[in-house]
C-alpha cells in the first residue's frame, strides 16, 4: 500500500511539474526545534493519510459485510427451497417406486425381509450433528439426490412431454441466457468503474498528501516562506468565514505560489472527476441492485404478465399437477384393492395351510399305526418261521426214525425167519426122537448114520440160519454205526447250535439295548417335535398378529402421508408468505440502514466541521499571537512558542510522544495512560473515544 501511494504521489508530482519540489534557500538557519517540528508534521500527515485509508476501508468493509449478509440469506433461502424441492421429488418418486415394488412375489419379499433384518442387526446409525451452512459433502449429496430424483421423474413423465413444452422450455432457457449475459456485462462494467474509481481515489489521496505537505508551516519555514502564508494555507478555503479572514490577513507576501495554484487546480479537477465517478458508480450500483433484486425476487404475477412462455409452462404445470393428483388417487385405489386382495390371499393361504396340517397329522397318525402293525406282523412272521423250522427239523428226525424202524423191522423179519427155521429144526429133532450122544464107539452103523443124517440136517439148518444171522448182524452193525454217527452228528450240531444260540443271545441283547436307546431317542425326538410344533404354532400366531399390525401401520402411514402432503402444501404457502414478509422486512431494514448511514455521515461531517473550526480558531489565535510577537521582534519568543507546540497540551511538562489513531492528536504517554486509567477514554480536543490499542508511539 505504501509503495502504491509513493508511486501515485510520484506520478502526481511529475504531472504537476518538477518545480514543486525545487530546493529553496532558507531565510534563516534551521534549528533542531524546526527539524523536530518538521518530523512531527510529517508523522501527522502520515497519520492523516492512514486515517483516510482507514475510513475508506471501513466503509468498504461495511459494504462488503452487508453484501455478505445478503448473500448468506439468499444461500440459506435457496438451500431451504432446494430441500423442499428434494423432499417433494423424493415423495413423488418414492410413490412411483412403491407402486413398482408391490409387484414382487411373496418368496422374494421374505428373502428381502430376512436380509433386511440381518442388515439391521449389523447396522449402527450415526445421527449427523446440526450445522449452519451446508458443507461441500452435504451439497454434493444433495445435488446427487436431486439429480437422481429428477432423472427418475423425467424417465417417468418423459413420454408425456410434448414438443411444444420442449420449445417453451428452450425459449425460457434462451431468455435466461440473455439475461445472464446482460448481468455479466453490467458486472464487468461495474468492475471497470470500480477500478477507475479506485485509481482516482488513490490519486486523490496522493494529492491530499501533497497538499498537506505544501500547507505544512515547518516545510515552508525550511523552504524560506513566511509563517503568515503557512497559517493561511492551513485554513479551510471552502468556508466563507475563513475566506473573509484570509482576505483581511492576506498581503502581497502571503499569496500562493504558482505551483500551489496548479496543484490546487489539479486537486479540484480530480475532486470533480471523483464526484462524477462516484455518482456514476452509485447510479450503476443502484441499477445493478435493482436488477439483482428484481431477478432474485421475480413474482409470478410479473412472469405471467411479461412472459407468455412462463404462463404456458404454469398452465402445463397445473395440468401435470392435476394428472399427478389423479394418478395418486388411482394409485391409492389400486393400493386399497391390492391390500384387499392380499388379505384374501392371506386368508386363503391360512385356510389351505390349516387343511394341509390337518391332513398331514392324519397321515402321520395312519403311518404310525401302519408302522406298528408292520412291526407286529414282522414279529409274528418271525415266530411262525421259527416254529416252521422247528417242525421241519422234527419231521426230518421223524422220517429218519421211521426209516431206521423200517430197516429194524426187516432185520426183525429175517431174525423171525431164522428163528422159525430153528424152531422147525428143533421140532423135527424132537419128532424124530434121536438121542445124540457123544460116545460114538458104542453105537452101531445105523445109529451112526442116523446121527450123521441128523447132524447133516442140523448142519443144513444151521447153514441156512447163518446167512440170515449174518444179514441181521450186518444190518444191526450198520444200524449201530449209523446210530453212533447220528449221535456224533447230533452232538456236533448241538455244539454249533449252542454256539449260535450264544451269538444270537448276544445279538439279541445288543439289539434290545439298541432298541432301548432308539426308544429313548424316539421319545426325545417326539418331545422335540411337540415343542417344535408348539413353537411353529406360536410363530404362526405371531406372524398373523404382525401382519395385522403391518396392515394397520400401512393404513396409518398412508393417512400420515396424505396428512404430510397437506401440511407441506400449507407450509409452502406459509413459506411464501414468510418470504414476502421477509423481503418487505429486508427492504425496511435496508432503508433503515441507509438512514443510519446517512445520519452517521452527517454526524461525521459535523464533527469534522467542528474539529476543523476549532483547529482554524486555534490556528487563528496562534497566528494572531505570532503576529503580535513578530511585531515586537522576539525570536526567542517564537522558539518558545514552537517549544509549547511540541510540549504536551495537558501537562505542559512532557514532550508529545503518543498519538491517537482515531483522530491524530498527539499527547505525552503519561497523560494518555492517566486518562485511560481514570476511564476518561475520549480525546480532550475532539471528544472521539479511544482505547489502549489506539495509542501510537511517535519518535521525534
From Swiss-Prot:
It is an enzyme of class 2 (transferase). Residues 102-117, 232-261 have a biased composition (Basic and acidic residues). Pathway: Protein modification; protein ubiquitination. Keywords: Chromatin regulator, Coiled coil, Metal-binding, Nucleus, Transferase, Ubl conjugation pathway, Zinc, Zinc-finger. The keyword Transferase applies. SUPFAM superfamilies: RING/U-box (SSF57850). Residues 8-18 have a biased composition (Low complexity). It comes from the Eukaryota. Disulfide bonds: none annotated. Residues 1-28, 102-131, 224-261 are annotated as: Disordered. It is found in: Nucleus. A zinc finger (RING-type) spans 648-687. GO terms for molecular function: ubiquitin protein ligase activity; zinc ion binding. One of its GO terms (biological process) is chromatin organization. PANTHER family: E3 UBIQUITIN-PROTEIN LIGASE BRE1, RING FINGER PROTEIN-RELATED. E3 ubiquitin-protein ligase that mediates monoubiquitination of histone H2B to form H2BK123ub1. H2BK123ub1 gives a specific tag for epigenetic transcriptional activation and is also a prerequisite for H3K4me and H3K79me formation. Belongs to the BRE1 family. This is E3 ubiquitin-protein ligase BRE1. The lineage of its organism: Eukaryota, Fungi, Dikarya, Ascomycota, Saccharomycotina.
